[in-house]
Amino acid sequence: MARSFSLLMVVLVLSYKSICSLGCDLPQTHSLRNRRALILLAQMGRISPFSCLKDRHEFRFPEEEFDGHQFQKTQAISVLHEMIQQTFNLFSTEDSSAAWEQSLLEKFSTELYQQLNDLEACVIQEVGVEETPLMNEDFILAVRKYFQRITLYLMEKKYSPCAWEVVRAEIMRSFSFSTNLKKGLRRKD
C-alpha cells in the first residue's frame, strides 16, 4: 500500500510541478483551495483510524503506467484534473452524503469544484499545444481504474463507516503530500 501510494504522490507532484510551469495561469487561489480541501478532509474524520485497521486495503495505484514517465504539460493537467474529478465524484454520491457531516462535505466539494474549474481553463488553453491523445487516454484510464477499485471496495464493505475512513485517509494523504511537495518545489524555483 505504501509503495502504490508513493507512486500516486509522485504523479500528483509531477502534475503540480508541470502545472506550475505552464503557460496557462492558474489563479493564486488554486494552491490555497488545495490546502483548504486538505483541512476540510481532515476535519471530516468521524471515527478513529485505529479502529479501522482491519479494513485497510491495497488500492493498487497502477505503478507501471506512471513509473519514470516525464509528463507533458497537457498530460499533467489532464491527470491532475481526472484525479480531482474522480475525488469529487466519489464524495458527491448519496452514500458519501450519509457518511459525512453535511456542511464539511459541501465545503470540501466546493473546493474540489473550484480546483476543477481552474484546471479546465488550463486544459482549454493548452489543447492543441502539445496533444498526445493516446498516451493521455492511457493515464486517464489508469486513474479511472484506480478510483473504480476504491468504489468497488466501498461497495464490498457496504459503505461502512470504517470503509469510508480508509478511503478518506487515502485521499487525504494524497492531498497532504502534494501540498507539501508543491511548497518545496516553489522554494527551489
From Swiss-Prot:
One of its GO terms (molecular function) is cytokine activity. One of its GO terms (biological process) is cellular response to virus. Keywords: Antiviral defense, Cytokine, Disulfide bond, Secreted, Signal. Residues 1-23 form the signal peptide. Its main location: secreted. Coiled coil: none annotated. It is found in: Secreted. Pfam families: Interferon. One of its GO terms (cellular component) is extracellular space. Disulfide bonds join 24-122, 52-162. InterPro entries: 4_helix_cytokine-like_core, Interferon_alpha/beta/delta. Produced by macrophages, IFN-alpha have antiviral activities. Interferon stimulates the production of two enzymes: a protein kinase and an oligoadenylate synthetase. Belongs to the alpha/beta interferon family. This is Interferon alpha-7. It comes from Homo sapiens (Human).
